[in-house]
């Protein structure tokens, strides 16, 4: 028992040093900006992609595929909404923050204050930062994915939202610049 207690502080210090913001792993994928379109959950064919999976960095369909981080819909009053998992009754897991910064000026995702409980009302030129559902990173530690997005257009007649998104698909990294992130 004394042996364990003697080395416990050293182990704790090593664990903290290894983790940091990137959970002690190296980034392997370069961040890039992509332009994607999502269709409203309601009043569109089920075969159209209505959600986004941040670990894949791709839009996904919601029929039979519940592993997504946020979805798009248009409510009965005509407001365009980005929905994290909370309002969809899938658990308070993913979330958004609206940003006052321009899309290109966002360099790193904040570490907290994501809205997990309610829809984000968006319009053309809305800029937001997204945090994914909690995941287990390749090193076995808990983490999340982060992305910044900029709404480019919302077409009411087709119920389609188009946005540019930079999704850091390196688990646990918060860097939101083009290229391989360092943190």
Per-segment meaning from a language model:
Residues 1-17:
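Sec-dependent bacterial lipoprotein signal peptides
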């Amino acid at each position: 028992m004394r042996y364990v207690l003697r080395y416990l502080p050293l182990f704790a210090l090593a664990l903290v040093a290894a983790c940091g913001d990137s959970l002690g792993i190296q980034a392997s994928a370069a961040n890039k900006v992509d332009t994607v379109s999502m269709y409203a959950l309601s009043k569109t064919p089920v075969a159209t992609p209505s959600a986004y999976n941040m670990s894949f960095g791709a839009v996904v369909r919601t029929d039979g595929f519940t592993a997504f981080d946020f979805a798009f819909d248009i409510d009965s009053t005509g407001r365009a909404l980005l929905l994290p998992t909370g309002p969809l009754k899938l658990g308070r897991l993913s979330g958004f923050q609206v940003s006052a910064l321009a899309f290109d000026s966002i360099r790193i995702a904040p570490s907290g204050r994501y809205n997990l409980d309610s829809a984000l009302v968006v319009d053309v030129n809305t800029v937001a930062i997204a945090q994914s559902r909690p995941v287990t990173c390749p090193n076995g530690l808990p983490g999340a994915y982060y992305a910044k997005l900029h709404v480019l257009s919302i077409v009411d007649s087709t119920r389609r939202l188009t946005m540019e998104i930079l999704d850091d698909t390196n688990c646990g990294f918060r860097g939101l610049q083009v290229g391989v992130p360092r943190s």
